[in-house]
Amino acid sequence: MNCKIDYQPAPNLLANRVVLVTGAGDGIGRAAALSYAKHGATVILLGRTIAKLERVYDEIEAAGGPQPAIFPLNFEGATLKDFHDMAETLDKEFGRLDGLLHNAGLLGRITPFDQYNPELWQQVMQVNINGPIWMTQALLPLLQQSEDASVIFTSSSVGRKGRAYWGAYSVSKFATEGFVDVLADELANQSNIRVNSLNPGATRTQMRRSAFPGEDPFTLRTPEDIMPTYLWLMGPDSSGTSGEKLDAQPPRV
């Protein structure tokens, strides 16, 4: 396991870096956006609920971080044109992208496969893998403008070992792991872009509550607790690390 939960980031770790976080309105995305801004990054907050993004925006400003930006987008309905329009807007505003955290995700249902709704399956695949893939393609020219770019795809333990009833979510995370291998290998030795997958582990989030409704959330780490690995992967201390499968926290005993 490759875990950096004890990492001690420099206060200015991400100074002068432009970082986009998807699903930035709450949970791990919110914690990552706040943490990246605290360490100097200009954060682009992407999500589907403007009110949530505005709250995170206000939190960053109140903490004295660099002025963030808000970009509303719903992966479920996003088209290739939406991604390319977004890239064009970011190019005009920032001229480059130094980091991309694919955090937005959809659980779907934990249910036997023979009862899985095909429309829900397609929604999960769109949000968890298809959308992030085509967004990454649209943003590659901006990432190539950075001297040291990091792309992080959110994985899961069920994307590394399949579990009964996890259906589309598990399959989408296996696809994520495969795409990280492909893209990292493709960009090796010809790009300043590193690409890795990161499994947050058991964390106190709404998705976790939906998946494990009987679990005591206070036995879990908070999103803030697992930020060291997110910071390490996004910052220059992980330079040269690409195509790796990392964990944000040690496995639960």
Language model: regions and residue ranges:
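Substrate-binding pocket helix/loop in short-chain dehydrogenase/reductase
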Residues: 86, 111-113, 117-123
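Conserved glycine-rich cofactor-binding loop
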Residues: 18, 23-27
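Rossmann-fold cofactor-recognition segment
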Residues: 63-79
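Conserved glycine-rich Rossmann-like NAD(P)H-binding loop of the short-chain dehydrogenase/reductase
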Residues: 41-55
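C-terminal helical subdomain
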Residues: 3, 189, 193-198, 205, ...
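Catalytic loop of short-chain dehydrogenase/reductase
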Residues: 133, 144, 148-189, 202
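Active-site loop of short-chain dehydrogenase/reductase
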Residues: 17, 65-66, 96-98, 143-156, ...
